[in-house]
Amino acid sequence: VAAIQTVLG
């Protein structure tokens, strides 16, 4: 996924 990496930082 990609949206998850955004919240991870």
From Swiss-Prot:
<keyword id="KW-0624">Polysaccharide degradation</keyword>
<dbReference type="GO" id="GO:0005576">
    <property type="term" value="C:extracellular region"/>
</dbReference>
<dbReference type="GO" id="GO:0008810">
    <property type="term" value="F:cellulase activity"/>
</dbReference>
<protein>
    <recommendedName>
        <fullName>Endo-beta-1,4-glucanase</fullName>
        <ecNumber>3.2.1.4</ecNumber>
    </recommendedName>
</protein>
<keyword id="KW-0378">Hydrolase</keyword>
<comment type="function">
    <text>Has endoglucanase activity on substrates containing beta-1,4 glycosidic bonds, like in carboxymethylcellulose (CMC).</text>
</comment>
<dbReference type="GO" id="GO:0030245">
    <property type="term" value="P:cellulose catabolic process"/>
</dbReference>
<keyword id="KW-0119">Carbohydrate metabolism</keyword>
<keyword id="KW-0964">Secreted</keyword>
<keyword id="KW-0136">Cellulose degradation</keyword>
<keyword id="KW-0326">Glycosidase</keyword>
